[in-house]
């Protein structure tokens, strides 16, 4: 695997990516970072956002939920709650999720419900980022 990285993206539902790639980019707890072959070993938390990778000169994009990333010996292991290829995001479903999240957040802030405010904010963030990624990166 000379000058390549082994990228594995795994969720509780199974493996999403298992490929040899040229480079990987995502958003960690301390900000965005990139990984290239020969990168030093490290581990970080992953924030809700995008994960992109270059393979054979072409960029590929995923939505990723919170999780962890380990870089070790030219291997990038990403363990996240969920991951979805951007081209597979159902924008209408994401918009419906956004509307539900906004309503739950409104009710939680007004004290009208027992909904956990942090969960409502996380749902809003997930829906917003999914829509942004799908509409900006994939022509519809």
UniProtKB/Swiss-Prot annotation:
It is a peripheral membrane protein. GO terms for biological process: proton motive force-driven ATP synthesis. InterPro entries: ATP_F1_dsu/esu_C_sf, ATP_synth_F1_dsu/esu, ATP_synth_F1_dsu/esu_N, ATP_synth_F1_esu_C, ATPsynth_dsu/esu_N. Gene3D superfamilies: ATP synthase delta/epsilon subunit, C-terminal domain, F0F1 ATP synthase delta/epsilon subunit, N-terminal. Its main location: membrane. It comes from the Bacteria. Keywords: ATP synthesis, Cell inner membrane, Cell membrane, CF(1), Hydrogen ion transport, Ion transport, Membrane, Transport. The keyword Membrane applies. One of its GO terms (cellular component) is plasma membrane. GO terms for molecular function: ATP binding; proton-transporting ATP synthase activity, rotational mechanism. Pfam families: ATP-synt_DE (PF00401), ATP-synt_DE_N (PF02823). It is found in: Cell inner membrane. NCBIfam families: ATP_synt_epsi (TIGR01216), PRK13446.1 (NF009980). F-type ATPases have 2 components, CF(1) - the catalytic core - and CF(0) - the membrane proton channel. CF(1) has five subunits: alpha(3), beta(3), gamma(1), delta(1), epsilon(1). CF(0) has three main subunits: a, b and c. Belongs to the ATPase epsilon chain family. Produces ATP from ADP in the presence of a proton gradient across the membrane. This is ATP synthase epsilon chain. It comes from Thermodesulfovibrio yellowstonii (strain ATCC 51303 / DSM 11347 / YP87).
């Amino acid at each position: 695997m000379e000058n390549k990285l082994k990228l594995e993206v795994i969720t509780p539902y199974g493996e999403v990516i298992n490929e040899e790639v040229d480079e990987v980019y995502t958003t960690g707890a301390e900000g965005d970072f990139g990984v290239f072959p020969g990168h030093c070993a490290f581990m970080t938390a992953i924030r809700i956002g995008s994960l992109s990778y270059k393979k054979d000169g072409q960029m590929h994009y995923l939505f990723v939920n919170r999780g962890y990333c380990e870089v070790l010996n030219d291997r990038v292991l990403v363990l996240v709650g969920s991951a979805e290829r951007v081209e597979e995001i159902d924008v209408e479903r994401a918009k419906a999720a956004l509307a539900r999240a906004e309503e739950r957040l409104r009710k939680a802030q007004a004290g009208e419900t027992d909904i956990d405010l942090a969960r409502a904010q996380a749902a809003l963030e997930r829906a917003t980022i999914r829509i942004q990624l799908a509409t900006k990166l994939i022509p519809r």
